[in-house]
Amino acid sequence: MLARWLQRQWFDQRRRQPALWLLLPLAWLYAGLSALNRLLAKPKHLPVPVIVVGNIIVGGAGKTPLTLWLARQLRDRGWRPGIVSRGYGRSGDEVRTVSAQSRPEEVGDEPLLLARRSGVPVWVGRHRAVAGEALLAAHPEVNVLLCDDGLQHYALARDVELVVFDVRGAGNGWRLPVGPLREPVSRLASADAVICNGQPETLLPTATPSFEMSLKPGLFYRVDVAGQSASAESLRDRGRLYALAGIGNPERFFRTLESLGLSCETRPFPDHHRYVAADLAFAKDGILLMTEKDAVKCAGMTAGETWVLPVQAELSPALIDLIVEKLRGRQVA
């Protein structure tokens, strides 16, 4: 409840709750600790180029679809990528490989989705440089690493930084917890590219090359019946529709369903939420729709008809051209 209240204050410019300013001392403390963390970090350089995908705001902005797009584009251009991630929400911090059969509570929901969708090696670890070393030892053919959600992990040296936003932009422009920013907007000046998931409500004040990303919905597929797919049109008149989302910005998923003509009773959950069967009981008399990230955690829990909506990132090829040019510069150096 508190997290949702804060997000409304951060991103709705019409809301100016005086209570928010009581958190200013915490914002100054957070900013100071963040600066100290970056100052004290000793970046570890890996033997292959590293592309970091992250954001300076809290919550989901589309990093995972972008990482999948990058893996696919790099492979198409002859590169052999691997992916490292912390694996938020998992039970341990140890370095380990992620396979399609891994358990989400052991590796994290996003790394598991990346392993199932990307077709490239995926490893997780609290210390991404150590995870990267383990991945490279196990897969010596890998010649570029993607670090998912690693912008603030300064212990890992990087060659390319990609910063992701969604249509909400930088919100009220304040640091946590007064606003949604992990780092100041001025941080964008040192990034290689800014990617906005959708048309931003306000332009970001940066001269860094910017690219728009759109998430194209695919066909729904059944969680409990392999190989069965359906269009949004075919689901409209099938019965009562419900939707859940435990992602950084659940409303984005619910708006996508609306854009497909699907009217649903919605249920948001916190990002990286660990589902239990009772969480899905609200949809027992109808059809439940969810994201792919939620589906990897709900296997075996669904009592009724459950469908998943996959999405695929679409971006200008100019972005991958920019990235490949920088990677080749690293090889020459």
Curated annotation (Swiss-Prot):
The enzyme's main class, written as a single word, is transferase
Picking any one GO molecular function of the record gives: ATP binding
Q: List the disulfide bonds.
A: none
Question: Part of which pathway?
Answer: Glycolipid biosynthesis; lipid IV(A) biosynthesis; lipid IV(A) from (3R)-3-hydroxytetradecanoyl-[acyl-carrier-protein] and UDP-N-acetyl-alpha-D-glucosamine: step 6/6
Tell me a GO biological process for this protein: lipopolysaccharide core region biosynthetic process
- UniProt binding sites for ATP: I57, V58, G59, G60, A61, G62, K63, T64
Provide the reaction this enzyme catalyses: a lipid A disaccharide + ATP = a lipid IVA + ADP + H(+)
What Gene Ontology terms describe where this protein resides (cellular component)? plasma membrane
SUPFAM superfamilies from the xrefs?
P-loop containing nucleoside triphosphate hydrolases (SSF52540)
Family per record: Belongs to the LpxK family.
Extract the HAMAP family matched here.
LpxK
Protein role: Transfers the gamma-phosphate of ATP to the 4'-position of a tetraacyldisaccharide 1-phosphate intermediate (termed DS-1-P) to form tetraacyldisaccharide 1,4'-bis-phosphate (lipid IVA).
Q: What is this protein called?
A: Tetraacyldisaccharide 4'-kinase
Whose protein is this, by species? Dechloromonas aromatica (strain RCB)
